[in-house]
């Protein structure tokens, strides 16, 4: 559908889908994703999170996902590194042993999200 389109003709969400797909298509051993969803609407964000999980499972690529969004981290990750404030150091390594797709309203998901939130409070 978008094969003949120029980047300027694509919506932000479509362009981001293409970028993520292209990154996985290169079959890298390691993929670094630094806040890839930016100001994307929540519906597209949920869709892309599930696509990243699907592609990660299909390819076996190690994905390092950088985010300030706690719910996103708990939804996507097998391991979360909780950092301290400046200067940033690893405060805790947390394993998340929940099956995908994760239920964001499930009690265990909420418990983990709350725990991570409590660990990063420095006020």
Regions found by a protein language model. Give the residues of each.
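Conserved catalytic motifs of ABC-family nucleotide-binding domains
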Residues: 27
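Conserved ABC nucleotide-binding domain
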Residues: 1-8
């Amino acid at each position: 559908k978008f094969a003949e389109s120029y980047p300027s003709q694509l919506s932000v969400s479509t362009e981001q889908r293409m970028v993520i797909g292209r990154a996985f298509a290169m079959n890298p051993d390691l993929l670094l994703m630094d806040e890839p969803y930016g100001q994307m609407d929540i519906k597209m964000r949920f869709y892309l999170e599930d696509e990243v999980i699907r592609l990660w499972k299909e390819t076996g690529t190690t994905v390092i996902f950088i985010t300030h969004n706690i719910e996103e981290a708990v939804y996507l990750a097998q391991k979360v590194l909780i950092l301290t404030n400046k200067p940033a150091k690893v405060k805790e390594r947390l394993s998340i042993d929940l099956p995908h797709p994760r239920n964001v309203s499930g009690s265990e998901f909420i418990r983990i999200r709350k725990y991570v939130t409590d660990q990063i409070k420095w006020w």
